[in-house]
Amino acid sequence: MLPVDGEERKSEGSDTEGDRTSPCAVSSATLKDLEVGGSGRRCSDPAGQPSNLLPQRGLGAPLPAETAHTQPSPNDRSLYLSPKSSSASSSLHARQSPCQEQAAVLNSRSIKISRLNDTIKSLKQQKKQVEHQLEEEKKANNEKQKAERELEGQIQRLNTEKKKLNTDLYHMKHSLRYFEEESKDLAGRLQRSSQRIGELEWSLCAVAATQKKKPDGFSSRSKALLKRQLEQSIREQILLKGHVTQLKESLKEVQLERDQYAEQIKGERAQWQQRMRKMSQEVCTLKEEKKHDTHRVEELERSLSRLKNQMAEPLPPDAPAVSSEVELQDLRKELERVAGELQAQVENNQCISLLNRGQKERLREQEERLQEQQERLREREKRLQQLAEPQSDLEELKHENKSALQLEQQVKELQEKLGQVMETLTSAEKEPEAAVPASGTGGESSGLMDLLEEKADLREHVEKLELGFIQYRRERCHQKVHRLLTEPGDSAKDASPGGGHHQAGPGQGGEEGEAAGAAGDGVAACGSYSEGHGKFLAAARNPAAEPSPGAPAPQELGAADKHGDLCEASLTNSVEPAQGEAREGSSQDNPTAQPVVQLLGEMQDHQEHPGLGSNCCVPCFCWAWLPRRRR
C-alpha cells in the first residue's frame, strides 16, 4: 500500500508541477495567438498532428511505453521529472522560432514602408520641380509669342513703308522724265533762237549791203525793227538760260532726293535682314529648348515606368498589415495623379510644339512672299530700264518731228513769199509806163532783174532744204524703226503702223503698254511724214497750183501736221501787220528788201506770240502722250 500512496503523492506532485508550469504554457499560447492575429492556426508538431505536450490542469502527463510495462521504484523520481522537463523545453523552442520570423517580417515591412515614404517624398519634390519648370516654360513661350507678334507687326509696317517708297520712286522717275523732256524742249528752243539770231545777222548784213546801194529807202525803219528783234531775241535767250538753270537746279534736287530715298531703302533693307537673322536665331533656340523638353519628358516617363514596375512587383507571401495596404493604395493614387499630370504636361508640350510649327510655317511663308516681292521689284526695275531706252528714242523722234514741222512751216512761208513776189512782178508788168521813172535811169529793169534773181535763189534754197530734210527724215525714221523693231521686249510686237492707241494687254504692265503705244505712234508718224513730204514736193514743183497767201493752208500732211497747221494759223494772223508794213515800204523803196522785212516781222510776231515750250507747263506735244500714260 505504501507504493500506492507514493504514487498518489507523486501524481499529486506532478499535478502541482503541471499547475505550476501551466501558466507559462498559457502565456506562450496567448502570445502565439496574438502574433498570428486570428489566423486560426494551432500549435502543431512537424508532422501536422496536434501536440499533446501541453499539460492539462488536474491531469498527469502520460508516461512512455517502457515505464508503463516496468514497475518503477518508489524512490526513482527521474521517472516522474525528466519527461516533463524535456517536453517543456521542446515546446519553448518551437514557440520562439515563429516569433522571431514574425519580428523579422515586421522589420522588413517597416523598412519597405520607410523606403516607399522616401520615394513618395522624392516624387513630390520632382513633381514640384516639374511644375515649376513647366510654368517657366509657359512664361518663356508666351514671351516668345509676344516677340513674334511684334516682329510680324514690324514686318507689316516695313512692307507698307516699302510700298510707299516704291510709289514715291515711281513719281520721282515720272517727274524726272518730265523735267528731262522740258529741258530737251528748252535746248531745242535755244538752238532755234541761235539759228534765228544767225538768220537775223545774215539778214542784217543783207540789209546793210542794200542800204549801201540805196540808203534812201527804209533804212531807219529796218534798223529799228532789227534792233527790236535783236533785243527781244537777247531777252528771250536770257530768259531761256535762266529757265534752263532753274531746271538744272530742280533736276539736281530731284536726283538728291532720289539718292536719299535709295539710301533709306538700303538702310531699311539692312535692318529687315538683321531682324530676320534674329528671328532665325530665336527659332533655333526654340528648337533646342524643344529638344531639351522632349528629353526631359522622356526621362520623366522612364522614371514613371520604373516606379510602376516597382509597384507591380509581387509582394512577399506574408500578408501585409492593414495600415501598409492603405498607404500603398494612397501611394498608387498619388502615382496615378502624378502620371496624369505628366501626361497633361506632355500634351501641353505637344500643343506648344504644334503652335511652334505653325509659327515656323507662317514665318517661312512670309519669307517666301518677301523673296517673291523682291524678285518682282527687280523684274520691274529691269523692265523700266529696258523701257527707258525706247522712250528716250521716241522722245527724240517727237522732238525731231516738231523741228520738222517748224521747217515745213518755214518752207510754206517761203512759198507764200514766192507767190507774193510773183504777184508783185505781174503787177509791176501790168503797170502803165506813166508810173515808170524817167527813161535812162534803169530803175525798174534793175528791180525786175533783182526780183528774178531772188526768186531763183529762193527756189534753189527751198529745193535744197527740202531734199536735205527729206533725206534726213528718211534716215532717222529708218534708224528709229529698226531700233524699235530689234529691241527686246513687247514694245517691238506692238509697234504696228496702225497708230499709237495701244493699251497694255493682260500680260503687260502699264509702262510696257505705254512704250508699245509710243512705238506705234513713232512708226505712224514716220509713215505720215513720208506721205506728207511727197505731196509737199509735188506742190513745190508745181507753183501754179499753190494757194493764194490769204487762203487757208490745205491739209495735205495728214494727222501729223495738225499742230503745225494750228501754229501756222496763229503765225499768219500775227504776220499780217508786218506784211502790210513791208508792202508799203516796197511800194516806196526797193522791192528786194520785202522778203527780209517779212521774215523779220514774222520773227517778231513769233516772239510776241510764243509757240511750243514757252510756258512752264506741259508742252503741247505732250498732251497726246499724257492721257495714254494715265491709262
From Swiss-Prot:
Q: Where is the composition biased (Basic and acidic residues)?
A: 1-20, 128-152
What is the topology of this protein in the membrane according to its UniProt annotation?
Peripheral membrane protein
Q: Where is the composition biased (Low complexity)?
A: 78-92
InterPro entries per record: GM130_C, GOLGA_cons_dom, Golgin_A
What is the protein's name according to its record?
A: Golgin subfamily A member 8A
Query: Region entry Golgi-targeting domain: which residue ranges?
Result: 519-631
- Where's it found, cell-wise? Golgi apparatus, Golgi stack membrane
Alphabetized UniProt keyword annotations: Coiled coil, Golgi apparatus, Membrane
The segment annotated Disordered runs over 1-103, 127-154, 426-447, 488-520
